[in-house]
Amino acid sequence: TSKISTTYEEEGRQSKIQPRAFVITRSGPTSRSSSYSARQSYGSRSSITPGVYQQLSSSGITDFRGTREKEKREMQNLNERLAGYIEKVHFLDAQVKKLEAENXXXXXXXXXXXXXXXXXXXXXXXXXXXXXXXXXXXXXXXXXXXXXXXXXXXXXXXXXXXXXXXXXXXXXXXXXXXXXXXXXXXXXXXXXXXXXXXXXXXXXXXXXXXXXXXXXXXXXXXXXXXXXXXXXXXXXXXXXXXXXXXXXXXXXXXXXXXXXXXXXXXMDYAEFWKSELSKCVRDIQSAYDEKIDIIXXXXXXXXXXXXXXXXXXXXXXXMQLQHVQEEVKKLRTQAGEKNAAYAEXXXXXXXXXXXXXXXXXXXXXXXXXXXXXXXXXXXXXXXXXXXXXXXXXXXXXXXXXXXXMELEIACYRKLLEGEESRVGLRSLVEQAIGVQGRGTASLKDTIQQSTASGSMTVQRSSKGPIAFNSVDQSGSNIVIENTTSGARAKTQSLKGWRVDKTVAGRVAASIELKNYDLPPNTKYTIWAKGAKDRATADNEQIADMFSLGVG
């Protein structure tokens, strides 16, 4: 049978329910088992019965069936360690992937930078710009790189025209991507600088200005930068028509900014636009002065030539005089036209300035109104708070009164239930309390009896280490204790624990325990407010309730 039991343990756990197939026979006293024959079918192990084994193991003697259990435990440990390793491997794998992605991004950026640095030839720079534009469609960071590339191209200044074209393309790309508004503004500024350097492509500069205006329409935040760029373009351009276009663009920008004035308040708008408009006006005036000077110089030269010719021949002089007079007329009409245009522009500027001032005044008025409304709201809130405080005081008074009223209500209810027999107040009170006067001396005794016979349940058991030890009948204190002992003994911090009092399924009061470490098998007392003045030991606490519950 010993061999049978070992094979049983190696095979693992068979079902405990086995058919009784063995034959019970009477055997000789010499035979080993007197109850039944030793020829047991199946390996019903005769080593130890399950009940005995259970008792032994619960009393701490375990190693009867030891080898198998040890194997099981070792397998469990190995499995846990394997799971830990697998988790680590997953984590490292994720980190490696992240680092690889970062490396790739860094390499791409480095490659782009290297390409920009290496491209000395104009064609190579143009190709790099095209590549950057393609990247810009892909990502915003690439757009920043494109801006850097444009700056590099401007610095190289190998082919100014090509650089301008590339800048225009970059500006278009920036316009396409609304996300990189700031980048677009920077690109526009770069484009303006490039246009100034080129100075040949005035039309390109105008286009850039238009693009800047569009960008301003797209993002009002960059409007100031756009206006500055427009002013720079106006200064750079010598052509009067271009200047007029720039002025129109500036006016449009001013209108847009005036519309956006209410949105954000960073600086006094009226002053800012006044200074900006005066700048523009000054530029225009200087341009017109130059034009008039040139015209006058040309007229003087023509007159000198006419005088020299007149000295040569009188008839020819008469003819030339007529010509000169015609020329002077033409020039005068031109000057008149120019002056009229300038006056118009000045009038428009004045009107825009007036509009800006009006908008600023309106904004100030709105702000004042908002402040007044806020003050009124604050006053209303204060009044409401005072009312709420008064209501809270009234509620407290009502709650105090309610307790006194409940007994009276019970008595009146008894009266109303229609007992015809005239009943004394005392028996009424006894009925309400639920006590028949068992020869008690006075009403006070009955009430005390009823409080003693009332019921209050306390949660004695607890899942955690802390349980109730005792609860005072008169409601003056509650004692809790740390019940851990033996191997599970540990100190428990009371921080964050509460003692709740529930009445009819609703939490009537909850007491937050103070931050105190309660060692095992130690008590902690919670006193009601009137029962004790102050905590004498540090394992005590005074609650802010007058009674913790009676009964």
Swiss-Prot record:
- Where the record annotates domain LTD, the positions are 454-551
* Name used for this protein in its record: Non-neuronal cytoplasmic intermediate filament protein A
What family is this? Belongs to the intermediate filament family.
Q: Where is this region: Coil 2?
A: 276-423
Q: What is its main location?
A: cytoplasm
Region Head, as annotated, extends over 1-74
What exactly does this protein do? Answer: Epithelial intermediate filament protein.
* UniProt region (Linker 12), positions on chain: 259-275
Region Tail: which residues?
A: 424-551
User: Which SUPFAM superfamilies does the record associate with it?
Assistant: Intermediate filament protein, coiled coil region, Lamin A/C globular tail domain
Q: How does it assemble?
A: Can form homomers.
Domain IF rod, by residue range, is 71-423
Cytoplasm among the record's keywords?
Answer: yes
| Assigned keywords, A-Z | Acetylation, Coiled coil, Cytoplasm, Intermediate filament
The chain residues annotated with the modification N-acetylthreonine are 1
Q: Where is this region: Coil 1B?
A: 121-258
The listed locations are: Cytoplasm
For region Disordered, the annotated ranges are: 1-54
Q: Carries keyword Acetylation?
A: yes
For region Coil 1A, the annotated ranges are 75-106
Q: Which GO terms describe its cellular component?
A: cytoplasm; intermediate filament; nuclear envelope; nuclear lamina
State where composition is biased (Low complexity). Answer: 25-47
GO biological process terms held by the UniProt record = heterochromatin formation; nuclear envelope organization; nuclear migration; nuclear pore localization; protein localization to nuclear envelope
Q: Where does the record place the region Linker 1?
A: 107-120
